[in-house]
């Protein structure tokens, strides 16, 4: 296994690309070979994207009461969770959070809403455009948005008010998607990705591992992201939330998570691959290893409905690894 990992690493370092069969070979790594795989993924990350860790922060500006049935989500009306639905968050609170995250060291700030999506006619969308105009004036953060499905016209309007990157996750492989979502289709999500590209924004598109998919399906998913040529790939690790359909899913083992991160880097050598939610409960004391397994970005602060670590703890972890912020 060692020799094969090294050979495929050299192939990628020399500018080549691995195929799905070769990715499945890497997935056979176990025990110490996973650490070798992680180290080689770090070499690939160093060559293609360097040693700087991009830090993103998010804020839920409209929470809960979502009509979609995503099996993992605490905000769905199909589930019985402890989430309290809210209307649009006050503009001043959003500004205050942005300034606090900028002071803490974040590079990007993302406004997130619950629901299937928005059009340019929605009143909440018009409010969000106004908020982005203020953010562009009052902070130096790169601005991101995550508002669900999006028309091409709405995407253009976001770009015009300063949004540079749009997040819309595919969540998982096409072959597994219907096990997780039934109220909309994979192609609807892909259509939004295409609209974002047409508008000239970067695409942030990832998903969640640990929902019951196979490693083969994770690899299928990574190659879909490669084909779509997305810019940033947030990888969540399922944090099963009580009251959702996936509340009883077992956690992935830390080494399984690390192996998955590394394989994504082999498949997507020059992309921004980042930690998203779930690292605290799944990786525990091994969170640093993710950044040494090919990741070059992370969400800091709290998530949409779950708590993250203290920001300074994450910043110290990055410094301890010899990486740059």
Curated annotation (Swiss-Prot):
Subunit field text: Homodimer.
> Which free-text remark accompanies the cofactor?
Binds 1 [4Fe-4S] cluster. The cluster is coordinated with 3 cysteines and an exchangeable S-adenosyl-L-methionine. Binds 1 [2Fe-2S] cluster. The cluster is coordinated with 3 cysteines and 1 arginine.
| Pathways involved | Cofactor biosynthesis; biotin biosynthesis; biotin from 7,8-diaminononanoate: step 2/2
Task: State what this protein does.
Answer: Catalyzes the conversion of dethiobiotin (DTB) to biotin by the insertion of a sulfur atom into dethiobiotin via a radical-based mechanism.
Query: EC class of this enzyme?
Result: transferase
- Per UniProt, residues of the Radical SAM core domain are 49-279
**NCBIfam families documented for this protein:** bioB
Protein's recorded name:
Biotin synthase
* Protein EC: 2.8.1.6
Write down the required cofactor(s).
[4Fe-4S] cluster; [2Fe-2S] cluster
What catalytic activity is recorded? (4R,5S)-dethiobiotin + (sulfur carrier)-SH + 2 reduced [2Fe-2S]-[ferredoxin] + 2 S-adenosyl-L-methionine = (sulfur carrier)-H + biotin + 2 5'-deoxyadenosine + 2 L-methionine + 2 oxidized [2Fe-2S]-[ferredoxin]
Q: Binding residues for [4Fe-4S] cluster, per the UniProt record?
A: 66, 70, 73
Q: Which GO terms describe its biological process?
A: biotin biosynthetic process
Q: Which GO terms describe its molecular function?
A: 2 iron, 2 sulfur cluster binding; 4 iron, 4 sulfur cluster binding; biotin synthase activity; iron ion binding
* Sites where the protein binds [2Fe-2S] cluster: 144, 204, 274
């Amino acid at each position: 296994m060692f020799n094969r990992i090294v050979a495929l690493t050299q192939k990628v370092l020399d500018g080549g690309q691995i195929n799905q069969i070769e990715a499945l070979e890497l997935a056979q790594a176990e025990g110490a070979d996973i650490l070798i795989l992680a180290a080689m993924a770090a070499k690939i990350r160093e060559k293609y994207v360097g040693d700087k860790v991009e830090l993103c922060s998010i804020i839920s500006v409209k929470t809960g009461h979502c009509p979609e049935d995503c099996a993992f989500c605490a905000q769905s009306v199909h589930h019985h969770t402890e989430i309290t639905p809210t209307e649009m968050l006050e503009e001043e609170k959003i500004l205050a959070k942005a300034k606090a995250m900028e002071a803490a060291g974040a590079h990007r700030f993302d406004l997130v809403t619950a629901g299937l999506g928005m059009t340019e006619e929605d009143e909440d969308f018009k409010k969000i455009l106004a908020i982005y105009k203020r953010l562009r004036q009052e902070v130096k953060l790169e601005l991101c948005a995550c508002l669900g499905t999006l028309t091409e016209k709405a995407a253009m309007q976001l770009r015009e008010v300063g949004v540079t990157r749009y997040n819309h996750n595919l969540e998982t492989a096409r072959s597994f998607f219907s096990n997780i979502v039934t109220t909309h289709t994979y192609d609807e999500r892909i259509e939004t990705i295409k609209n974002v590209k047409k508008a000239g924004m970067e695409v942030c598109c990832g998903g969640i591992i640990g929902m019951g998919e196979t490693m083969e399906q994770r690899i299928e998913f990574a190659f879909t992201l490669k084909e779509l040529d997305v810019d940033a790939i947030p990888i969540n690790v399922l944090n099963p939330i009580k009251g959702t359909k996936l509340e009883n899913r077992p956690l992935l083992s830390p080494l399984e998570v690390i192996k998955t991160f590394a394989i994504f880097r082999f498949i997507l050598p020059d992309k921004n691959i980042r930690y998203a939610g779930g690292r605290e409960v799944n990786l525990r004391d091994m969170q640093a290893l993710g950044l040494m397994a090919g990741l070059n970005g992370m969400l800091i602060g709290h998530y949409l409905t779950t708590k993250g670590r203290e920001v300074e703890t994450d910043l110290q972890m990055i410094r301890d690894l010899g990486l740059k912020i």
